[in-house]
Amino acid sequence: MKKFLVISVYSVLTLSTLLVFWQVRNFDFANYDDNYYVSENQHVLNGLTLDGIIWAFTTNLTGYWHPLTWLSLMLDCQLFGPNPGPIHLINVLLHLANTLLLFAVLKKMTGSLWPSAFVAAAFALHPMHVESVAWLQTKRPRYGIYF
């Protein structure tokens, strides 16, 4: 019975997160920073190249040093081209992975199923995360949780 409840929590977290954020697959590039990060950045649009990788580790184009973000965007463009829909979905999947990881870690640390599920659901669905899920260039918070 307990295993069924845990699987049910994972399922509900997955379905609710996808239900809320699935619409981003139809979003376009944002007018704020996406041009610097993707749509007008030839290093990113070229995909993963040696020059691009070197650039990712040596640039502070936007005032930040975040090579993992650049490499991730390059990989996205390598796989999907300059199409924002799949890149948005990658952000959703990263957010979902973070949500499930949070639930697993909290459950392991506390042994409490329902409080862990509640915190993970609040993390997954809180409006504060809309920006970091729906905006292409905000991969930093998605990757930061893994460390």
List the predicted regions and their residue ranges.
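Polytopic membrane enzymes that build or remodel cell-surface glycoconjugates and lipids
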Residues: 1-147
